[in-house]
Amino acid sequence: GELLDSYYMNQYTTQQYTDRVNEYYNTLCSKVDIWEIGNEINGEWLGNTTDVVAKMTSAYNIIKSHNAKTAITLYYNYNCWSNPQNEMFRWAIQNIPANMKSGLDYVWVSYYEDDCNNYQPNWQRMMDSLHTIFPNSKLGIGECGTSIVSQKTQYMQRYYKMNITTPNFKGGYFWRSNRRDCSTSI
C-alpha cells in the first residue's frame, strides 16, 4: 500500500505524515501486505531532506512495530538531478538509517527514461549495487514507463524481458500507466 505519492510529500508535516501512516495502517492492515513507507523518496521535489528522512523513518518504525512488511521506492536519476545530494545511491547511503538498510523488506526503483535524457541503465550493475546497500531486501522495479506513445511497446518489451541475476531481485516492472497503455485500444 502506497502511503503517499511522492508528488504530495512536501504538503505534509512530519506529524501529518505520521498521523496518515497510523490512520492507513489501522484502517487497511487486513487488506495490505506490503507498506510503501516512501515513494521516490530521494526525489528533489519532496522537500527538505531532513523532513523527508523524518517522515520516512517514522513510517518505517510504525509499520515495523506491527511486524508488517515495508518497502521503499527510490528514484533513479543518473546524471539528471539538480542537486548531487539527491543522486539515488548517494542519498540512500547518506540518509537511510542502518536499521532500515538491513530491515526493509523491499527496495524498489522508479525510473523513467524520459526524465533522464533517455539514459538506459545497466540494470544488472545497478541492482548489484543496491544489493550491497540493502543486503536483506528483495529488489525490483517499482515504477517505469514513458509518455512517448511511439516508444511504449519498445520500452515495455525492454523492461519486461530483463534478465537480472542479482540475489533477491524479484522483478516488479510496474508499468505506471498499465491499464491505459495495455488496453486493446492502443
Please report, for each region that a protein language model flagged, where it lies by residue:
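Substrate-binding cleft and catalytic face of glycoside hydrolase catalytic domains
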Residues: 1-80
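Acidic-and-aromatic substrate-binding clefts and catalytic sites of carbohydrate-active enzymes
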Residues: 5-15, 42-50, 75-89, 112-123, ...
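Short, acidic/polar
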Residues: 13-27, 83-98, 154-163
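Extracytoplasmic low-complexity repetitive segments enriched in small/polar residues
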Residues: 19, 23, 57-58, 117, ...
